[in-house]
């Protein structure tokens, strides 16, 4: 039996594959985390967007359809990346999306992905040799344009990802949208980003995602 295909705004087509989670919104004809995406669409256009923890492509597809000239879709889980690439193909967005099958960390290396729940995105990065680990700074080599937005939802490794982003933050000053689940993570992100001239501005969603913007030259 073939997978169900659903249309989303922007001419995007997606296939529905269990488990549903964010795809419940797709079945209603809308994107997951729509308020966050609407804010990004209103305030940030052009350049390269980096979708760290792209999962099955919800944010990548929106960015490619509405906001960015290029999207780097960074996702370490093979099954998720395959679903993402199918959605990109169906939507005709191959020329705008650059897939990167890797986890994000403070340093390049190797690791493994441990499935820690039932949903597509519930994988944790652990020691191993099954998947590449890259840094946000290393991704600069793939960027065709200055980086406008970085979104990070990488299951407890957001702080490590920020530690590997010094050159990117200094060069392009992108807006950052980071999922930070604990007060400790929030404080750690503030400590990294404040010396780089960033201010935490807005909070979105029940799994809190925070916007950070560069506040000085």
Label each residue range with its predicted role.
Residues 98-100, 201:
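General small-molecule cofactor/ligand-binding pocket signal
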Residues 50-52, 74, 102, 150-152, ...:
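Active-site flanking residues adjacent to catalytic metal/cofactor-binding acidic residues
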Residues 102-106, 135-136:
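Conserved SAM/SAH-binding loop
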Residues 54-56, 78, 104-106, 154-156, ...:
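Short, glycine/acidic-enriched loop or turn micro-motifs at the edges of active sites
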Residues 28-48, 110-112, 120-172, 183-188, ...:
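Short internal loop-to-helix segment that lines adenine-nucleotide cofactor pockets
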Residues 122-123, 186-217:
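Binuclear metal-ion centers of metallo-dependent hydrolases, dominated by the metallo-beta-lactamase
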Residues 1-87, 91-92, 96, 140-143, ...:
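S-adenosyl-L-methionine
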